[in-house]
Amino acid sequence: MRSDVSTTSGIFEANRARGAVRFDVHARDGVTRRGALHESGSLRVRFPSPEGEGLSGVFVNTAGGVAGGDRFDIEISAADRSRLTLTTAAAEKAYRATGPAARLNITLKVGAGAHLSWMPQETILFDRARVQRRFDIDLDEAASLLLCEIVVFGRTAMGERMEQGEFVDHWRLRRGGKLVFAETVRLDGNIGAKLARSAVTKGAAAIGTALIVPGDEALVERIREASDSFAGEVGISAWNGFAMARFCAQDASRLRADMMAVLARTGAALPRLWLN
């Protein structure tokens, strides 16, 4: 019996996707260039032609999605005065899990005078998907950051909703070596019922977050001026030198439109893939 269990476990592990990307960028003569790059497994990053002084990177998951037991690790370092924008080639899909949760670990380090925009396309969680994600962000006090994430609970365009599963999202932000923001979102079990609660999303199928560093009340007021155009619910606040906008909407397209309206008030440049 033990041998059969061990064999089954080994087969499951062997069939799980693994992927890792690690690279750094640096600025020279006002132009951002890529340094050392490491890629392994089914995760890749491609760099389109540079636009101005900044560098853009596009992540590609050749596994075609995320399933239970998969693991992906991303580690990025942006040196002083560099400018980097990161996105994904398509929406990421997390499929039904029959075993342990998929694990996604993202580590970002941004130096003095540098800027990093993390703007992937949405993550779509299928019913009974299991995903555990972690962001560890280390900013110099003089660095700037725009981090945007959209999560959709089910393929809403197909009339599907995520009813059961697991989604755990850890965010840790350090600035100047000090922890200034820590949050863990945990949804598991009967996710459909939890999302229906007024204190959660009031039935909305898509949620989003935009973390803006630096950010202050003046930025919050500029964003609030656009509130009449929002298709969903948007909340914005600022503290500890950064601002955070939270979104919920009935589908990804409405939420993305609201997020783009907010980002327009920050002066952020959107990745071309967001405009397709």
Please give the residue ranges for each predicted region:
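N-terminal intrinsically disordered, cationic/polar leader segments
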Residues: R2, I11-A20, D24-S40, R103, ...
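N-terminal, charged/glycine-rich beta-strand/loop interface patches
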Residues: R2-E122, D127
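A short, polar/proline- and glycine-enriched secondary-structure boundary/capping micro-motif
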Residues: L43-F47, Y95-P100, R128-R130, T156-E160, ...
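Short, surface-exposed charged micro-motifs
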Residues: E75, T107, D136, H170, ...
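Short, structured patches in soluble enzyme cores that scaffold and shape functional sites
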Residues: A78-D80, T88-A90, V110-A112, P120-E122, ...
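Structural motif
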Residues: R83-T85, H115-S117, S144-L146, G208-T209, ...
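Internal active-site segments that recognize and position negatively charged phosphoryl groups
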Residues: R133
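A structural signal for small-residue-enriched, beta-sheet-centric alpha/beta enzyme cores
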Residues: V151-N276
